[in-house]
Amino acid sequence: MRHRKSGRQLNRNSSHRKAMFSNMASSLVRHEVIKTTLPKAKELRRVVEPLITLAKTDSVANRRLAFARTRDNEVVAKLFNELGPRFAARQGGYTRILKAGFRAGDKAPMAYIELVDRPAAEEAAE
């Protein structure tokens, strides 16, 4: 029985899921917008939002926790130096999911997941 088991399996084993979401979270923090399938985007929210909340309080312990989840020093630096201060006044809801139609090959529902309050220069570049 799967009572009280939260999260999607996404046809992957647990280590593959953990690695995939770690990589996707790093990409989202680095680029601030990524395109992926809708179910992956919805699950990615559950990984990224706690990371940003962690980054709002800068401490060595929090930096180590963030590094343990992302395994990328550049991403940890951006989280604590840019995103933490940017979202200091916001209590959650740091990401936005925009539906982007269906993929040509297999009709999988696609979506953009982005950080809210992105700088205007990045939006103009896209």
Curated annotation (Swiss-Prot):
Coiled coil: none annotated. This is Large ribosomal subunit protein bL17. Part of the 50S ribosomal subunit. Contacts protein L32. PANTHER family: LARGE RIBOSOMAL SUBUNIT PROTEIN BL17M (PTHR14413:SF16), RIBOSOMAL PROTEIN L17 (PTHR14413). One of its GO terms (molecular function) is structural constituent of ribosome. GO terms for cellular component: cytosolic large ribosomal subunit. SUPFAM superfamilies: Prokaryotic ribosomal protein L17. It comes from the Bacteria. Keywords: Ribonucleoprotein, Ribosomal protein. Transmembrane segments: none annotated. GO terms for biological process: translation. The gene is rplQ.
